From Swiss-Prot:
Pfam family, one: NIR_SIR_ferr
Alphabetized UniProt keyword annotations: 4Fe-4S, Cobalamin biosynthesis, Heme, Iron, Iron-sulfur, Metal-binding, NAD, Oxidoreductase, Porphyrin biosynthesis
Enzyme's top EC category: oxidoreductase
GO biological process, one term: porphyrin-containing compound biosynthetic process
Native source species: Sinorhizobium sp
Name of encoding gene: cobG
EC number: 1.14.13.83
Chain positions recorded as siroheme binding sites: C381
Record field: catalytic activity: precorrin-3A + NADH + O2 + 2 H(+) = precorrin-3B + NAD(+) + H2O
InterPro entries referenced in this protein's UniProt entry, alphabetically: Cbl_synth_CobG-like, NIR_SIR_4Fe-4S, NiRdtase/SiRdtase_haem-b_fer, Nit/Sulf_reduc_fer-like_dom_sf, NO2/SO3_Rdtase_4Fe4S_sf, NO2/SO3_Rdtase_FeS/sirohaem_BS
Top-rank lineage group of the source organism: Bacteria
UniProt keyword annotation of Heme present: yes
Protein name, per record: Precorrin-3B synthase
Pathway(s) this gene product operates in, as recorded in its UniProt entry: Cofactor biosynthesis; adenosylcobalamin biosynthesis; cob(II)yrinate a,c-diamide from precorrin-2 (aerobic route): step 2/10
Binding-site residues, [4Fe-4S] cluster: C338, C344, C377, C381
Length: 459
């Protein structure tokens, strides 16, 4: 979802005809794929709110034909295709263009996954997003902005974007005069710096003003670097007592009734990945049930549209057989993983296999009250923020960080031979010490980091 839109973006090539390498800090794209441990990786951000099933099937077919057949949905709800080569990226771009999938480039402009159809949203944010894209498109000289700069236009609803970090955030609020938009800078909705309130017709001019300010300061500047009081004056924001509603955290996996007999099915990818053939097979099956489109969603998830309550239940059962996360209670929802050693040259852990081992040996940890982060290295790409339990791969084995991020100092260690028993001991620690009605998170907090570390390392 960005300001620049094309049917497909042909990769740039260097003098030797190879795909251009990424500039530091940039997101991988068709024009600038990223080298990984399993070949080149491309991130695809469709401009359409909904992708028809034939388009997704065509994309899956192309991913298998021109890559290694692994498709990912990122934490922010973008598609990634893996295992490409310098020769196959242009052919992938052509296949995407032939499927008439419009790809977004440049500034990320994000709206909630069910924007326009969520009965609980305060306003439809898509017209503002479209107006902003168009305003940026017509500029004779494009703005030079930080590569990962993002604008979130959050209308609330069941699946709002309050937990998504943004450089510039707009949150809809209901006022006596109608809908207004609260402007803030940096962070999630609870940590962002508030600027002020804007009327609907003032939103896009204000956003352009902020983007111009960022561009004038250089391509490394982010929303957090701006002075809220200066932006308040520049954008002529009003101060108001209106505050956005607290962000909702409805789980995406599951069947969701939207009213008027409309039903959507939320599904998650197991450990952020799916095989292209499995995805295409599933979409063919649900197409026969009446499904007509999907919407990508944060949290490595997507929604299936066009179902009724009866067919949604069938589609959910089919999804389970294909390995998707189908319900809020799925233990895999509580695990965050990066690509791991199979997909990243920096990783020292095969994270997907480790995640499966964790589900099998320590299900007591995965009640949904905490997150277990499996990181191939100390960079912590899958989850930069702290987790209750973080397992980090290293040349000598694995480290455990309790209540910290992957770059934190581990408090316990084990090697490959001891990992299975270490995970089992953590599960047993919770099982044997958890009080009735107590969550795994509360239990581990009560026991303390020292005891958790000792169980992992020594038993």
């Amino acid at each position: 979802m960005t300001d620049l839109m094309t049917s497909c973006a042909l990769p740039l090539t260097g003098d030797a005809g190879t795909v251009a390498s990424m500039r530091r800090g940039a997101c991988p794209s068709l024009a600038e794929p990223m080298q990984t441990g399993d070949g080149l990786l491309v991130r695809v951000r469709p401009t359409d709110d909904s992708l028809t099933l034939p388009k997704v099937i065509a994309l899956a077919t192309a991913a298998e034909r021109f890559g290694n057949g692994i498709i990912e949905i990122t934490a922010r709800g973008n598609l990634q295709l893996r295992g490409l080569s310098a020769a196959s990226v242009p052919r992938l771009a052509q296949a995407i263009g032939d499927a008439e999938i419009a790809i977004a480039e440049g500034l990320a402009i994000e709206v909630p996954p069910l924007a326009g159809i969520d009965p609980d949203e305060i306003a439809d944010p898509r017209p503002i997003a479209t107006e902003l894209r168009e305003a940026l498109d017509v500029r004779q000289v494009p703005l030079k902005l930080a590569p990962k700069l993002s604008v979130v236009i959050d209308s609330g609803g069941r699946f709002g974007l309050g937990a998504v970090v943004a450089d510039i955030r707009l949150q809809a609020v209901s006022t006596v005069a109608g809908v207004a938009w609260v402007l803030s800078l940096g962070g999630t909705s609870t940590k962002a710096s508030s600027v002020g309130t804007l009327a609907g017709n003032a939103v896009v001019p204000a956003l352009i003003t902020i983007l111009e300010k960022l561009a004038s300061l250089g391509t490394t500047m982010r929303g957090r670097d701006l002075d809220p009081s200066e932006i308040r004056a520049l954008c002529r924001c009003e101060t108001s007592s209106e505050r956005p509603a607290a962000p909702r955290s409805a789980a995406i996996p599951g069947i969701h009734a939207l009213g008027n007999a409309d039903t959507v099915l939320g599904l998650g990818l197991a450990f952020a990945q799916v095989e292209a053939a499995a995805l295409a097979s599933y979409l063919h099956q649900v197409q026969a049930l009446g499904a007509n489109a999907i919407r990508l969603a944060p949290g490595h998830a997507f929604f299936v549209l066009g179902l009724c309550p009866e067919t949604a239940a069938v589609a959910q059962s089919l999804a389970a057989s294909h390995g998707f996360r189908i319900a809020e209670q799925d233990p895999r929802n509580a695990i965050a993983t990066c690509a791991g050693s199979k997909g990243c040259a920096s990783a020292w852990m095969e994270t997907k296999g480790m995640a499966e081992r964790l589900v099998e040996t320590a299900p007591e940890l995965l009640d949904g009250s905490l997150t277990v982060h499996l990181s191939g290295c100390a960079k912590g790409c899958a989850r930069p923020k702290p987790s209750e339990l973080t397992l980090v791969g290293a040349p000598s084995g694995y480290g455990l960080v309790v209540n910290g991020a992957a770059n934190g100092l581990p408090s316990a260690y084990t090697d490959e031979n001891g990992m299975g028993s270490a995970l089992a001991r953590l599960g047993r620690l919770v099982r044997q010490n958890k009080d009735a009605g107590e969550s795994a998170q509360s239990c581990l907090t009560r026991l303390g980091a020292a005891r958790v570390s000792a169980a992992f390392e020594q038993g």
